[in-house]
Amino acid sequence: PEASLDRLREGFPLETYRWIVWGRPRPVEAEPVPETLTLTNGTTLRPLPAPGYADDMVCYLAEDHGLLFAADLYITPQPQYLRFDENAPRLIESIHEVLAHDFETVLCAHRGVVEAGRRALSEKVKYMEALRGVVQRRYRYDKVTVPQITDEILGREGLLYWISGGDFSKRNLIASCLDDVPDRTGKIMG
């Protein structure tokens, strides 16, 4: 997306754990994503914006082949962690938007080929909506805190929390489920 071009050209900061694991990205000159891409074999890919894990994430649809190149949209059917900057409500919305298109197989950057990918994404969005509903009820009506809800639903933080300095955590997932919910003072969380 257009919004990413400056970041790609000028570089961007990464948390320490991310550059240790993946290295520091070098600045590159990039072009805006075209309305369609045609591969050398004639396959047409249509970009589908899918923010949630990142504000500039894009999936690619090869409708004639029933394929979705899903970037980080799928990863797992039941997420247990999110980074601090990820947005669960927007991710849910993006999955619904992608499911409005015709595909069966998901090509996932983390899981590889997911044959029943449409069903897998449907299961993921159902899980996330159910999780969000439980979190919102516990917070709003039962007056339970985010740390308490996290421990109840997902358990205590594990190694990923400590390695990432808290950037990648169960608590971030639970807190993100409240991003559009007023806190007890009436201010919108998130």
What is each residue range found by the language model?
Residues 1-2, 49-52, 68-71, 105-111:
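Active-site neighborhood of phospho(di)ester-bond hydrolases with catalytic His/Asp-centered motifs
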Residues 1-40:
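Active-site HxH/HxHxD metal-binding segment of metal-dependent hydrolases
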Residues 12, 80-85, 119-120:
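Short, solvent-exposed loop/turn segments at secondary-structure boundaries
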Residues 5-7, 54-57, 75-78, 111-116:
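Active-site environment of divalent metal-dependent phosphoester hydrolases
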